[in-house]
Amino acid sequence: MHTLSNLLSSIKNAQKAQKRVLYFSSFKKISKRKKRFVCSACKMMPRVFVSRLCWDFCRILYNEGYIHGFSQEADGSLRIVLKYHSSGIGVIKKMKTISKPGFRIYSSKNRLSKKREGLGITILSTSKGNLICDREAQKTNFGGGEILCQVF
């Protein structure tokens, strides 16, 4: 499974289960031949591969106000603190993967965020390898890129 898709589904599942904190870390070797997911200490969420993509995605969610924060733990895992309204409903209503490993979607800056009128964000991958949201792309006059996901 694609790393970003795995992170998106883990965040969705954690919000449905009303979890406050998620922990993500790299694969741990169980045997000489196999790599498997190792459950976290609380045994609620599987740990997924932490890459620069995950860090950039969490940075964008934090800057846009969708999560309270994220940090690196002593063991190298990624800790994400989810955000909820006072009624207990998660701030993130919907997360949708747009570009998939088998079907890539690209867009120019002119076609970004016109139909949503500022509701939610679209996350793009740049040619330099980092992630930016559609608002940053409009401000910096970025030409366009691969549309990874949308968050509402």
Curated annotation (Swiss-Prot):
**Stored Pfam families:** Ribosomal_S8
Question: Per its UniProt record, what SUPFAM superfamilies does this chain match?
Answer: Ribosomal protein S8 (SSF56047)
**What would be one Gene Ontology cellular-component term for the protein?**
ribonucleoprotein complex
Q: Is Ribonucleoprotein included in the keywords of this UniProt record?
A: yes
UniProt-recorded Gene Ontology molecular function terms: structural constituent of ribosome
Q: Which domain of life is it from?
A: Eukaryota
BP terms from Gene Ontology: translation
Q: Which UniProt keywords apply?
A: Mitochondrion, Ribonucleoprotein, Ribosomal protein
Instruction: Report the locations given in the UniProt record.
Output: Mitochondrion
Q: Family, per the entry?
A: Belongs to the universal ribosomal protein uS8 family.
PANTHER family with a match to the protein in the record = 40S RIBOSOMAL PROTEIN S15A (PTHR11758)
Q: What is this protein called?
A: Small ribosomal subunit protein uS8m
Q: What is the lineage of its organism?
A: Eukaryota, Viridiplantae, Streptophyta, Embryophyta, Marchantiophyta
